[in-house]
Swiss-Prot record:
Its EC number is 3.1.1.89. The active site is at 164, 190, 316. This is Probable protein phosphatase methylesterase 1. Keywords: Hydrolase, Serine esterase. It comes from Caenorhabditis elegans.
Length: 364
């Protein structure tokens, strides 16, 4: 069915309704993308029970863990899926590719796609000769080289998705044309230039306020949840262990000391709004609650230059706190822009009687 027909399709909640609705296309895409999802597991009370804090393996979420050898450096990459468009996921500072674990699993149930989540320089299981050069220039070169190492000349459409620092790098990577394949879309999660630049002043204090070490992985996961750093126990159990490293028996410290990279922080975010608006591909900005858009983004939003999505009841790490809702939004966005196809077509289920009646009336 063409976009024009979708835009004029009546509200089919009532068989007799003839009022057109411009938002019907979104409703149909949501139905097509989410149709067939298993019903959510009923929540259970944890009162009186000890919450499980053990580490979850990467293999519960991804299909493959691969090394990308680039000029003597070894970048660890998590991969899910073997066909379809490529979703290239870039994590924020201090995290790893496993921050996307729950989201990747959810997205793969909705659309046919490949998900690729590298550990960037200095993070996770990646090993580089210079672990602390997190400059914008070095990192976007890394991102381009990792992609080429994994996919070669694959010309499948690519959707670059980045969170926080990774969101800034996604924008810079796209504008610098570091990925030769067809970049079809850009999704940036919880990074706005104005807010990010303001937050940098308190970042060192925040980093020093965290525990310097943990006696075990379980204690680190417990801190991650109790501090509100993550709100999803499953995400914390797979992501938090990759953010720390064992330095001695019963002592784990942070994988990367982000304070040593302070000189690069400003370069990640400065001029980001104009660069974001200058990207010619379809764009979506995902925010954790209501954020203040700066002047450039406010004007751009009013002009329809990008889509905004606000997810409620989440912290900064949206992909960990609400992976299902984020996957729904990303899946709908990808289908709307013809980047991906839903795995579960509405045609696979018994047709809605209202739709049949509408088609009968209009001889479709």
């Amino acid at each position: 069915m063409s976009d024009d027909k979708l835009d004029t399709l009546p509200d089919l909640q009532s068989e007799t309704s003839h009022v057109t609705t411009p938002h019907r296309q979104n409703d149909l895409l949501r139905q097509a993308v989410t149709h067939g999802r298993p019903p959510p597991v009923p929540s259970t009370s944890t009162s009186g029970k000890k919450r499980e804090m053990s580490e979850l393996p990467w293999s519960d979420f991804f299909d493959e863990k691969k090394d990308a050898n680039i000029d003597g450096d070894v970048f660890n990459v998590y991969i899910k899926g073997n066909e379809g468009p490529i979703f290239y996921l870039l994590h924020g500072g201090g995290y790893s590719g496993l921050t996307w674990a729950c989201f990747a699993k959810e997205l793969a149930t909705l659309i046919s796609c490949r998900v690729v989540a590298p550990d960037l320089r200095g993070h996770g299981d990646t090993k580089c000769s210079d672990e602390h050069d997190l400059s914008k220039e070095t990192q976007i070169k890394d991102i381009g080289a990792i992609f080429k190492n994994i996919f070669g000349e694959d010309d499948s459409p690519v959707c670059i998705v980045g969170h926080s620092m990774g969101g800034a790098l996604a924008i810079h990577t796209l504008n610098a044309k570091m990925i030769s394949s067809k970049v079809a879309a850009l999704i940036v999660i919880d990074v706005v230039e104005g807010s990010a630049m303001e937050a940098l002043g308190g970042m060192v204090h925040f980093l020093h306020s965290r525990p310097s070490s943990f006696p075990s992985i379980e204690k680190a996961i417990h801190w991650c949840l109790s501090s509100g750093t993550a709100r999803n126990p499953t995400a914390a159990r797979v992501s938090m262990p990759s953010q720390i490293r064992e330095v001695s028996e019963h002592e784990y410290t942070w994988r990367i000391d982000l304070t040593t990279t302070e000189q690069y922080w400003k370069g990640w975010f400065e001029g980001l709004s104009k660069e974001f608006l200058g990207c010619s591909v379809p764009k979506m900005l995902v925010l954790a609650g209501v954020d203040r858009l700066d002047r450039d983004l406010t004007i751009g939003q009013m002009q329809g230059k990008f889509q905004t999505c606000v997810l409620p009841k989440v912290g900064h790490c949206v992909q960990e706190d609400s992976p299902q809702n984020l996957a729904d939004e990303v899946g709908r966005f990808a289908c709307r822009h013809r980047i991906a196809q839903p795995k579960f077509s509405a045609l696979a289920s018994p047709p809605d009687p209202a739709i049949l009646e509408y088609r009968k009336r209009h001889h479709q």
